[in-house]
């Protein structure tokens, strides 16, 4: 799984040098964080709607869009999928309640 995430991360990094006229991702980068966050919000909503429709194919399609735009955000902020995978590995074996209690400030 991390192979495709790594390849996407490389492509997304390269798109930082692309023209916004030639690349959808470069256009998102040029518009800035708020535009990327708006797109993530749209994709999250579409994911929820697909889940409510209870159609596996639509759920997979929308989650792929959501993951992709989340990867765009990570790249925009200078982060990599490996950073998230490391955090997930750190949490592995912790109960959700324990993990939440361990967070600074105890917020979501």
From Swiss-Prot:
Annotated compartments: Cytoplasm
CDD domains: NTP-PPase_HisIE_like
Disulfide bridge positions per record: none
Catalytic activity of the protein: 1-(5-phospho-beta-D-ribosyl)-ATP + H2O = 1-(5-phospho-beta-D-ribosyl)-5'-AMP + diphosphate + H(+)
GO cellular component: cytoplasm
UniProt xrefs under SUPFAM superfamilies: all-alpha NTP pyrophosphatases (SSF101386)
Metabolic or biological pathway: Amino-acid biosynthesis; L-histidine biosynthesis; L-histidine from 5-phospho-alpha-D-ribose 1-diphosphate: step 2/9
Record-linked PANTHER family: HISTIDINE BIOSYNTHESIS BIFUNCTIONAL PROTEIN, HISTIDINE BIOSYNTHESIS BIFUNCTIONAL PROTEIN HISIE
Protein name: Phosphoribosyl-ATP pyrophosphatase
Originating organism: Thiobacillus denitrificans (strain ATCC 25259 / T1)
